[in-house]
Amino acid sequence: MQEVISYIQKAVLEISNALKFPDTSYSQNQNFTGDTQLKFDVLSDEIITKTLSQCSSIKAIISEEKDEILTLNEKAKLIVAYDPLDGSSLMDVNFAIGSIFAIYEEKASAKKLRAALYSMYGARLELVICKEQPKLYRLNANNEFIFIKDLKINEKGKINATGGTQKFWEEKHAKFIKSLFDEGYRLRYSGAMVSDINQILLKGGGIFSYPATQDAPNGKLRAFFEVFPLAFIIEKAGGKTTNGKNHSLLELEFDKIHATTPCFFGSKYEISKLLKAYNE
């Protein structure tokens, strides 16, 4: 496991260096789910593929930017699924973006998720690594990731990060969001899931939501690359997650590697309030 994490650190550092002078234009290609790829999406995916291919502990890799699973070593046990550059559409406005990684054992399944990581490419390069407790690391002047602190979520937060086009929201979701604002919650939504989840973790609580909508009844966020790893981190930090029905996103099972799901992450208070609103 530690060997895999060390190779992920190498990939993250290389992506961070490449971001100093990036090409923010679009390519002529689309990924599996129909998103037009930025040239830097492709480059980030190539960097991660190249780096992880050198690790003998990895059985296979699954990328948001690839159609199929890429087998590396049949004798190994660990599978790495990743979003090479979450929030890449925000590159042209210079918002913070990141990479998300899930490490599964034997098969890609929430029940087999053993560790999760994400990087933040912002004013600083930071990395959150979670096996049992999410731990925040920061790159220092010597190009070393230094431990900063454990991350924990309070019972109740103040941040409301909600995605999806509002005119396509279900009425129950619109009412729930309004109830949060009526309680004094602050809107904090960037358009990059990893950045919004990171803020909730570092600020100690709140809620991130990307609901089912009329134009995306199964949600838009991908289970294996985005939803499962970030749900793993949130729950290990003391928070809760749900799809609006289940009591944890990590209870969900999917057959397709690019499957999507509605998803909600946050403090216990907000998720309990959401489940009540959704199931009245």
Swiss-Prot record:
Top-level EC class: hydrolase
Record: residues binding Mg(2+) 2: D83, D86, E226
Protein residues bound to substrate: D86, G87, S88, S89, Y189, K220
GO molecular function: fructose 1,6-bisphosphate 1-phosphatase activity; magnesium ion binding
Primary location class: cytoplasm
Summary of subunit composition and partner proteins: Homotetramer.
HAMAP family documented for this protein: FBPase_class1 (MF_01855)
Protein name: Fructose-1,6-bisphosphatase class 1
Organism in which the protein naturally occurs: Campylobacter jejuni subsp. doylei (strain ATCC BAA-1458 / RM4099 / 269.97)
Taxonomy of the source species: Bacteria, Pseudomonadati, Campylobacterota, Epsilonproteobacteria, Campylobacterales
This protein's encoding gene: fbp
